[in-house]
Amino acid sequence: MITDILAMNLQVVFCGINPGLSTAHHGYHFANPNNRFWKVIHQAGFTERLLTPAEEQHLLDTGCGITMLVERPTVEATELGRDELLQGGNAIVEKMTRYQPRALAVLGKQAFSQAFGIKKVSWGRQERRIGETQVWVLPNPSGLNRATLESLVASYQELHQALQDNV
């Protein structure tokens, strides 16, 4: 069972779509060796060193957390139903209202669109807020995403810099 890594007043909560089978098997977020999440957040400046999935609880020490839209593991996120994503969006709103991080970073444009019922979504900071929490949409670091490591890091650095600048 994959559990949220959450605490009050974090800098950012990264919101994955759902666990892949490798993640579900290992019991840690972003555990598939092809997933670039841990490398990306390190290179973007969120962690001082490269963490392994087994060290996910150390994220709290850096002001970061992790949650997911849907808890059901699948091979690909495309296997998720629309209702599952909408329910996930509602659950995320409840969690963010409760924990009040400075930012929520949803990892995937299509997942964000479906979970929050927003048709046109751009990358980066969104107009929508959840209470005082800024909402961002960042590219998914999955190995299935063709984005380069450099472009992923640049997107995540934009969020990191905005948080550093108190924007």
Swiss-Prot record:
InterPro entries per record: MUG/TDG (IPR015637), MUG_bact (IPR023502), Uracil-DNA_glycosylase-like (IPR005122), Uracil-DNA_glycosylase-like_sf (IPR036895)
This protein's assembly is summarised as:
Binds DNA as a monomer.
Lineage summary:
Bacteria, Pseudomonadati, Pseudomonadota, Gammaproteobacteria, Enterobacterales
What keywords would UniProt list here? Cytoplasm, DNA damage, DNA excision, DNA repair, DNA-binding, Hydrolase
* Reaction(s) catalysed by this chain's protein: Specifically hydrolyzes mismatched double-stranded DNA and polynucleotides, releasing free uracil
**GO MF annotation terms:** DNA binding; pyrimidine-specific mismatch base pair DNA N-glycosylase activity; uracil DNA N-glycosylase activity
Pfam families registered for this protein in UniProt: UDG
Signal peptide location: none
Compartment annotation: Cytoplasm
The UniProt record lists the EC number as: 3.2.2.28
The protein, known as: G/U mismatch-specific DNA glycosylase
> Which SUPFAM superfamilies does this UniProt record tie to the protein?
Uracil-DNA glycosylase-like (SSF52141)
In its UniProt record, which GO terms are filed under biological process? base-excision repair, AP site formation
Record has DNA repair as a keyword? yes
HAMAP family reported for this sequence: MUG
Q: Which GO terms describe its cellular component?
A: cytoplasm
Query: What is the enzyme's main class?
Result: hydrolase
Q: Which organism is it from?
A: Pectobacterium atrosepticum (strain SCRI 1043 / ATCC BAA-672)
What is the purpose of this protein?
Excises ethenocytosine and uracil, which can arise by alkylation or deamination of cytosine, respectively, from the corresponding mispairs with guanine in ds-DNA. It is capable of hydrolyzing the carbon-nitrogen bond between the sugar-phosphate backbone of the DNA and the mispaired base. The complementary strand guanine functions in substrate recognition. Required for DNA damage lesion repair in stationary-phase cells.
Q: Which family does it belong to?
A: Belongs to the uracil-DNA glycosylase (UDG) superfamily. TDG/mug family.
